[in-house]
Amino acid sequence: ATGWYPGTGNHGTGRQGIVCFKLDPMTGEILSDKKIISHGSGGKCPEGPHLYKKDGWYYLMLAEGGTEFGHMETIGPSRTIDGPYEFCPNGPILTARDDNGNGSPIQCTGHADIVDDANGNWWIVSLGTRPIGPMAHHLGRETFLAQLDWVDGWPVVRNGGLMQLEAEGDLPQADTVKPVSDDLHCDF
């Protein structure tokens, strides 16, 4: 069995990019040359690549723009794993930068991942901050979750690409595990 690993680096080009190479998942042995497959959508510091395969397309999702108030998540499809990737013409799929996020309680969104659940719903999980004033967020980066829809082959984060503090969603219900005993003895 083999796998593909996406990572970051400039590999002698002098320009940050996303590299991909084949590897043996059991040994970690690199089985192919490292190839730059993207320089991102144009935002600074493309990093945190994730590769997905859906409906015969490979999707490369990146964090771009740095981790503060310019942070964003971009995505592009390709028919082959090594590109070329054409990024979403509607801009980042997730961001609170510029006019899109003015007044949003959650800022600096990015470094995301997309998953589908057992019910076939799609979700995006992302880092973000809750500012307490201009350029200040005392809780650091937190994790947020939002629903995502696929529209004409593109992932679209609900609420205009903004995370919300509260949202409705059809989450699968887990069985509740009852405690074996509730006779805890404390003597301190």
PLM features: residue spans?
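Carbohydrate-active catalytic/glycan-binding domains of CAZyme proteins
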Residues: A1-F188
